[in-house]
Amino acid sequence: MLLYLSRQSIPIALPLLIDTDHVKLSYFFACFSFFYGVSKFVNGIIMDSKNNPLFMFGLCNIATGLLTIGITSSYNNLTLLLLTLILLAWTQGLGWPAITKFMVTNSSISSIASSWGVMSASQQLGSCITLIVLPSIIKIYDAKSAFLYSGLLCLLFGIYTILKAYYKESANFTTYYKVQKSQIGIKVTSSIWFLCCATFCAYIIKMGIFFWFPIILKNKLQISLVQSSLITGVYDLGGILGTLITGRISDMYFFQNRSLLASLYMLGIALTFIAMNFGQNIILMNLGAILSGFFIFGVQVLTGVIAVEIAPQNNVCAIVSLTGLFGYIASSIFSCVLLGVLVKHCGNSIMFSFFSICSVVALVCFSILSSKDLKKLSKAV
């Protein structure tokens, strides 16, 4: 939750600190997303051979806290700011592989989607709190306070987590984990490639909303930053519901074919953005925000669990992180740079049309995976 608090402060507070246009700002967002994705993949490979996810997660929070606070003193120099954001992205990339290792080694296959949903919901809670609280903090104090407070919370929580991990290790807690030695060679099947492609498209939407929703809604509806951030907060509220409900539904009814549920969700996302494209009032945008949040974060849970199920046992973290790598490469190129250019030249409404197209492509990929699951079930019968 606190890692997401730090990350969400970037698109809210950074535009207020540096005087630049959408396209130049998108380059900073792109670098952050790209290095976050690469770090996630590299650390995923490393975590397959490690047995201390709590310690690594605490270390991630400490480094994130220090670097987030560091933004307050580096924003005047764009080169130094870019370097700080790259380092921040790299340290945050350690967080999810550590969480994945913890969940895989402490959850059964019949309940992993529910656990994944709870963990994802905590991320959305952090984002929701950020979108509601940070604009008020910025209004009362200044933009630097957003980075200062979120960084300080991450730092304190990281210290607490490392101390907790140390005492658990001294009690032989780590012997609970069943660890297999990671192999350097990672076998990537056609199913994994289709999942990566689906994640690629889903993350264009997810990170496009993350980076651009507050700014574009402000311009499209002619409302204040506080109001547009609150609508984005409603999106994250829908995400919390989506992760929790999807995890439970997936474990109960779709455990043999989770890709089918993901296909239905992508169809829902496409229809939601088509409707939002024609919406010009706050009520419709709030409804669209909560529905899109429900569907897109539900898909995020499903992609992670599907990756766990189709990955070799000794490369689970690496394969889950590989899908994340594709997602954040997509976001760095399409959600940040391309979408920024499209909005500049075609207007704010192009975002919703762009997201609808991405939803359809992801729908096709999940449908192919679903058909493969159905063939496996028919052979088993």
Task: Give the residues covered by each predicted segment.
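Cytoplasmic helix-loop-helix junction between adjacent transmembrane helices
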Residues: 85-123
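Extracytoplasmic gate region of multi-pass secondary transporters
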Residues: 10-12, 190-244, 300, 335-336
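Structural signature of the two symmetry-related core transmembrane helices
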Residues: 55-70, 259-274
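Flexible cytoplasmic inter-helical loops of multi-pass small-molecule transporters
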Residues: 163-184, 377-380
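Helix-to-loop junctions at the C-terminal end of transmembrane segments
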Residues: 39-52, 244-255, 343
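A late C-terminal transmembrane helix in Major Facilitator Superfamily
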Residues: 313-345
